[in-house]
Amino acid sequence: MYNYTIYHPVKISGRGLYTGINSTITIYPELPHVGIYFLRTDLTDYPIVPIIPSTLLVLNSKLSTVLGFHDDYSIMLIEHLMSAISLSQLTDLKIILEGPEIPILDGSSIIWLKLLQQAKIYITSLSNCIIFKSSCTFFIQTKDTFIISFPYTSLAINTGIDFKNCLAIKSQWITILDLLINRFELVGIASSRTFGDFNQINILINEGFFQGANLYNALAFQLGNWCNGPLRFICEPAKHKVLDLIGDLRLLGVYNMFFLIGYKTNHFVNSQLVQFFKKLDK
């Protein structure tokens, strides 16, 4: 195992999905063994304190994963960027955020992935990162959502979704083995966009949520059909669930080895899974 960082900084700006506020994010190289951390530089009333991707700093996982110390010093929507970081196997980065939320961009991780590749990823040293292995089988369920974890020799995910009232989606299952070394699947996962019911999104917008949502940064369906198709590939919605799960699993650490079977997964149950893994690690 090795440590990886980037050769030069990269910057991008964009709108936040939930707040609608424009944010700028700059990603810098970092020294070996330092890890990944975020800094909010736009808050003049607070000292600049690193926010480290960790289960201890999860403030909210209802609609997305929010990290921070309190609501005023937090970072919203980390999962798409963290998924790109994991798929790139990066271990050491300093990430400066000017704004409350990481930009949604096109609703997937592909722009993040390409941005990191443009920054030229390289090996800095041998890694001392802990490889997290699950030695037991366990089951987590919330209503009709569940995740089962099995011991495995690498990271593998089998996930399913079920939208019986939407003919465009219906039931989808996808299995991806050896996730972090399966280069064939990497672009497909990273390109998968977030999605939702057009009518429900409009209701949430009127309630003050999803202020940055539009038909460019999210797939929307209505009356069983896509409002802004076509899909980039078959099972794009199911693959986006894999993308989100990879991003949330990055809170465990760099290298994870287990086989997950998930059904109707969301950020809340993903957070429960990560917290359970952390308890096993003690």
UniProtKB/Swiss-Prot annotation:
Gene Ontology CC annotation, any one: membrane
| Entry-linked PANTHER family | UDP-3-O-ACYL-N-ACETYLGLUCOSAMINE DEACETYLASE 1, MITOCHONDRIAL-RELATED
**Protein function:** Catalyzes the hydrolysis of UDP-3-O-myristoyl-N-acetylglucosamine to form UDP-3-O-myristoylglucosamine and acetate. Involved in the biosynthesis of lipid A, a phosphorylated glycolipid that in bacteria anchors the lipopolysaccharide to the outer membrane of the cell. The target for the lipopolysaccharides produced in the chloroplast could either be the cell envelope of the eukaryote or the plastid membrane.
Q: Name one Pfam family in it.
A: LpxC
Annotated organism of origin: Cyanidium caldarium
Tell me which Gene3D superfamilies the record gives. lpxc deacetylase, domain 1, lpxc deacetylase, domain 2
Q: Which gene encodes it?
A: lpxC
The active site is formed by H267
Tell me the protein's name: UDP-3-O-acyl-N-acetylglucosamine deacetylase
Which GO terms fall under molecular function for this chain's record? metal ion binding; UDP-3-O-acyl-N-acetylglucosamine deacetylase activity
